[in-house]
């Protein structure tokens, strides 16, 4: 894809719509004991998990527009540490920052969602198309996969992000699961998430109120989420800047003086796409592409059993 759309912030590649000041503020933030973080590599079920957590915290009354959602569940890297001061609590902070590029706490709670690298790559490709200017002519999937396996995409290498979190998957303050598990049994995992957040307050409440449980499941359906998250980055930047003064984030003011690029972009997928398992089969259609991925995966995971997470979904053998 187009490396002009990447910005290096202290060794971390990020999308050029992020501002270095806010990324650094997120990196340096010292977590509070009541903080809940949703940590993922991009396009691994981030928004879905955020919305589930929001609905659990609000007893099924999560925001139905992106602006209110971002105030309640801030994209930390984008909005900066200032977002923690205006966020209603309980709330959840979403971050794509790698494990070793942010301050960790043994008392805050972390939800990490992993997705198989093939489907992640496909979803990431379609998402980044929407952030690639039309002046970039080569937007083929083949070109993207070369950048993906080289770590020349926002937030760097997939496994460099996943493996440190995988090593912490059994920590008592970490809930680690896969997108595929969430997709296959959403009901069970919503309950596990609720128990992790607070079994008495949220988990037991869902067990005792089937109507509430179903309300949350319906709200977090793919169809409903497409309606809620149907706008682009420029829209939610402008809407955050238009908040009343008492709710406005100082960290977002940088977008007034350093606004987003107005270049016309290729058509991308937005924040919510197909939500399918196995769409990779429609994209990795050549032996060259499959071998490139297999070689990369074998090299990156030679000292880890992490690929066992997806032993049951018929990925290419490794």
Feature roles, as predicted:
Residues 1-177, 197, 202-203, 256-318:
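PAPS-dependent sulfotransferase catalytic domain
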Residues 39, 170-196, 227, 231, ...:
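Phosphate-binding beta-loop-alpha motif at adenosine-nucleotide cofactor sites
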Residues 47, 51, 163, 184-191, ...:
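Amphipathic alpha-helical interface elements that mediate macromolecular binding in regulatory proteins
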Residues 140, 178, 185, 209, ...:
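Helix N-cap and loop-to-helix transition residues
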Residues 212-294:
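PAPS-dependent sulfotransferase catalytic core
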Residues 199-218, 225, 303-306:
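Short, surface-exposed acidic
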């Amino acid at each position: 894809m187009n490396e002009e759309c990447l910005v290096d912030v202290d060794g971390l590649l990020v999308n050029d719509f992020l501002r270095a000041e806010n990324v650094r503020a997120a990196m340096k933030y010292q977590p509070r004991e009541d903080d809940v973080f949703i940590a993922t590599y991009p396009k691994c079920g981030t928004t879905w998990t955020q919305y589930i957590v929001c609905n659990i915290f609000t007893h099924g009354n999560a925001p139905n527009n992106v602006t209110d959602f971002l105030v309640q569940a801030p994209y930390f890297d984008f909005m900066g540490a200032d977002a923690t001061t205006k966020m209603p609590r309980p709330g959840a902070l979403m971050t794509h920052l790698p494990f070793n590029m942010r301050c960790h706490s043994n008392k805050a709670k972390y939800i990490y969602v992993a997705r198989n690298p093939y489907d992640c790559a496909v979803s990431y490709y379609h998402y980044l198309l929407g952030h690639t200017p039309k002046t970039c002519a080569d937007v083929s999937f083949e070109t993207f996969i070369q950048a993906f396996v080289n770590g020349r995409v926002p937030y760097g290498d997939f496994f460099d992000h996943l493996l440190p979190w995988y090593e912490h998957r059994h920590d008592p303050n970490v809930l680690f699961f896969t997108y595929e598990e969430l997709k296959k049994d959403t009901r069970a995992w919503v309950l596990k998430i609720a128990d992790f957040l607070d079994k008495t307050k949220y988990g037991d409440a869902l067990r005792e109120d089937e109507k509430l449980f179903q309300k949350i499941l319906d709200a977090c359906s793919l169809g409903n989420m497409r309606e809620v998250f149907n706008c682009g980055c420029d829209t939610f930047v402008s809407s955050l800047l238009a908040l009343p003064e008492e709710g406005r984030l100082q960290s977002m003011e940088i977008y007034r003086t350093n606004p987003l690029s107005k270049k016309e972009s290729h058509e991308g997928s937005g924040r919510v796409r197909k939500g399918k398992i196995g769409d990779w089969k429609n994209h990795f259609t050549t032996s060259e592409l499959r071998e490139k991925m297999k070689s990369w995966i074998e090299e990156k995971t030679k000292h880890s059993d992490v690929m066992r997470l997806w032993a049951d979904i018929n990925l290419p053998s490794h």
